[in-house]
Amino acid sequence: MNRRRRIYEGKAKILYEGPEPGTLIQFFKDDATAFNKKKHEVIDGKGVLNNRICEYVFTHLNKIGIPTHFIRRLNMREQLIKEVEMIPLEIVVRNVAAGSLSKRLGIEEGVVLPRSIIEFYYKSDELEDPMVSEEHITAFGWANPAELDDIMALAIRVNDFLSGLFLGVGIQLVDFKIECGRLFEGDMMRIILADEISPDSCRLWDIETQKKMDKDLFRRDLGGLVEAYSEVARRLGIINENEPIRGTGPVLVK
């Protein structure tokens, strides 16, 4: 593999310079982190599964007119993406009480919310991603009101799609996180979905058993993360029953 210029490295992914202007290569690592990197482990095969699941979801979103940065998958660990100017927000959509919402408001985990709730968090490891309001976002210039409207519209459409997708394979979409960016095309700019959608960024519960099929398995030391991610991929038809769940793929360029 040719050496490429590294643009950015995060907790679970690395961005490299792309083959053409306006493109990047997104590499999915096997690193699992929680609680702002206070907990860290390398889990063989996680990056491969997240790449495949993200490819599947983003391909379908693109097809139904929800714009994403995804262009195509390059190999088991990498995908070609459009370069965007990232908006420093995590957008969380909640359908069922779980995680920090349950702790913050004293709602029992598993309670279906009266309606889907959208929350915003400012991306900052140093500040541990504090929750912010729409007023904070516009006042500090992280996004203007029109961009915020576009982000919320994207979040609602993604929630509708993902809820139906997972329901069809016996999985409840409890909540999920997305990130968005500004895509510049000539004199035009539009807000599109970026980052990833995978079991790393969603809470997924088996409808019949309520078994967790997401990164909470790692957060709570329940084990079986790769097996759960593999089961999600199998139910979606991404991998077959006999396909191996572990694999190194390309070697990470240092």
From Swiss-Prot:
PROSITE patterns on file: SAICAR_SYNTHETASE_1
Keyword annotations from UniProtKB, A to Z: ATP-binding, Ligase, Nucleotide-binding, Purine biosynthesis
GO biological process: 'de novo' IMP biosynthetic process; cobalamin biosynthetic process
Reactions mediated catalytically: 5-amino-1-(5-phospho-D-ribosyl)imidazole-4-carboxylate + L-aspartate + ATP = (2S)-2-[5-amino-1-(5-phospho-beta-D-ribosyl)imidazole-4-carboxamido]succinate + ADP + phosphate + 2 H(+)
Pathway info: Purine metabolism; IMP biosynthesis via de novo pathway; 5-amino-1-(5-phospho-D-ribosyl)imidazole-4-carboxamide from 5-amino-1-(5-phospho-D-ribosyl)imidazole-4-carboxylate: step 1/2
Superkingdom of the source species: Bacteria
Pfam families for this protein: SAICAR_synt
GO cellular component: cytosol
GO-annotated molecular function: ATP binding; phosphoribosylaminoimidazolesuccinocarboxamide synthase activity
UniProt keyword annotation of Protein transport present: no
Gene3D superfamilies referenced in this protein's UniProt entry, alphabetically: ATP-grasp fold, B domain, Phosphorylase Kinase, domain 1
Residue stretches spanning the membrane: none
EC number: 6.3.2.6
SUPFAM superfamilies linked to this entry: SAICAR synthase-like
Keyword Oxidoreductase: no
Family, similarity comment: Belongs to the SAICAR synthetase family.
NCBIfam families, sorted: purC
Protein name listed in UniProt: Phosphoribosylaminoimidazole-succinocarboxamide synthase 1
The species this protein was found in: Agrobacterium fabrum (strain C58 / ATCC 33970)
Lineage: Bacteria, Pseudomonadati, Pseudomonadota, Alphaproteobacteria, Hyphomicrobiales
